[in-house]
Swiss-Prot record:
Keywords, sorted A to Z: Disulfide bond, Secreted, Toxin
Protein name stated in the entry: Augerpeptide hheTx3
Tissue: Expressed by the venom duct.
Any one GO MF annotation of this record: toxin activity
Post-translational modification: Contains 4 disulfide bonds.
Main localization of the protein described in the UniProt heading: secreted
UniProt domain comment: The cysteine framework is XIII (C-C-C-CC-C-C-C).
UniProt-annotated location(s): Secreted
Top-level lineage group: Eukaryota
Annotated GO CC locations: extracellular region
């Protein structure tokens, strides 16, 4: 999903968020 880094941190476990150039984030755990 598309989100800000703050939203991504809230959605993912600590240290798991990856954000690409288009600011789409995934939880990499």
């Amino acid at each position: 999903k598309q989100c800000t880094s703050n939203m991504c941190s809230a959605d993912c476990s600590p240290g798991c968020c990856i954000i690409d150039k288009l600011e789409w984030c995934t939880c990499d755990c």
